[in-house]
Amino acid sequence: MKYDLIIIGGGPAGYTAAFEAAGNGLKTCLIEKRDLGGTCLNRGCIPTKTLVHTADLYRTVKGDTPDLKCADTAVDYEGLNAKKENIILQLRGGIEKMLKAGKIDVIHAKATMKDAHTVRAGEELLETENILLCTGSEPAMIPISGIECEGVITSDDILRDLPQMEDLIIIGGGVIGCEIAGIYEAFGTKVTVIEALDNLLPGMDSEAGRSLAMVFKKRGIDVHCKTKAVSISKDEKLTLAYEEKGETKTVSADHILIAAGRKAVTDVFECEAPSMERGRFTVNERFETSIPHIYAAGDIVYGYPQLAHTAMAMAVNAVCAIRNVPFKRDLSVVPSGVYTCPEIASAGISEKEAAEKGMQAISGKANTLANARSLIAESERGFIKVTAEKETGKLLGTVMMCERATDLIQEAALAIERGMTVSELLQVIHGHPTFSEVFVSALEAAEKKI
């Protein structure tokens, strides 16, 4: 049987592409070697957010507040892992039903490409007009001695079966490292975070990273930025040697989590592979690789953020390109979120990035101290900062560190994508009392500078 499209990889990019292709009349086959849903559903976004939710609840009930006294509260790790697995199974079952309803052929096997029109799925050879690579990513390891020691783990290991720990060292202060640090701190684990760059969350606004470090330190997490991991050794516990401010120091723990980013999975070629940069495929404006009829979407594509919602949008547009119809998704503004407590989210560009692009920009900022909902929720101090073009007032970017930031950022993303100005946004009445009123205060601060 010859297909119009074979998709390799059944994560967010893969199954989204399958729905889009089959829904528009393309004979479609989806090949996945593991579980449908990919990293996001099985070893990433969904299990992490399940654990974050429980951690936030536990942090609340164990806190010393005047209105809530909960004695003998404890984390049931067995129950928490079961809850996580049930959520994964429920969501995976939904994907399976939708694929079946769409009459999409699903093959569970290791896929490799013989050429641009032939795919090997296990022992079976399949012919196709086009191939879409959605093979995703996996945890990247760092080249230091002792990395092979028992107890050195990745996010895959933690999210497969959450272990109870007395202490944990996390190498990497990015999104994954910070989210897991927050989870384990809430559960009573002694956490140490080692980050090589200047701030936590190096890919986001520096103020957010510095503010999160202050929150972490207040809660007892040891944070070491501008610090290099040197080596790992094992005796009764694991010991990490690290360099900080010219000195070599050590710290010990039950486990060491390597959270130093992710690398693309690209081992799917029996033929010549498409062009790559920094380990990821390069694509043109149609998401086509250097080899005609071979497309790519998701974490494996160079130049795009490794986010599930980005992957899904890329997949839809790649199928549009295959069908020779206009794109359905605008990838110029991609919101991102960090599920710490408080949450952090951003969309668009910062004032510094605007200046680097030759734009004259201003920013407005409001903190959460005077916000009624934040006070009611006993939130940590947070802020919302907006960046706008000085001449036109057009909103360019927003960063938030507050309750519900990952939900609130959608309003900012929509406004940036639609080219709305600060004054236009201020015409919209926001409810009271809501967390979103801090966004209004930030806009008002910006308007005074325009």
Give the location of each predicted region:
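Beta1/beta-strand and adjacent pyrophosphate-binding region of the FAD-binding site
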Residues: 1-13, 165-174
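Core beta-strand elements of the Rossmann-like FAD/NAD(P) dinucleotide-binding domain
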Residues: 1-3, 122-130, 246-255, 290
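Glycine-rich flavin
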Residues: 2-3, 19-26, 31-164, 192, ...
